């Protein structure tokens, strides 16, 4: 199946687990752990196509990740305020739509996760099945459950999203311009 697509830069909203990933900052994960369930995870499920195993050792394209990081440097150099960028990290994909419990976040931290979101899987593995390079540009919108005295509210998340998406949009424009 040729879709004419060769690369995907996914934009994900995440909660921060790692102490250096602050709300309003950007992360470019290099690994992920999938905690989701009951999602269609393959085009090769035996119904449509014969089962096919893919190497998913490195789920994100390093070439695209480097272009995202370069775009962040370029956009930061043009901005008076700039944005903090975490150049790697482990993305935990949870089921949603509810946010995680404090205990779940403690477990994710013990598992080595730096950020948590509800999107990104199975998208990353589906892209790999189709031989489409894939990377994530993650906008941190809040501290994960139990990591801040402040309650997590949708209003707070939307406020950070609104401000952060201007920066993300500038990064995407920079990536597209140099593709």
Could you describe each region identified by the protein language model?
Residues 1-143, 155-179:
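Glycine-rich phosphate- or other oxyanion-binding loops that anchor nucleotides, phosphorylated ligands
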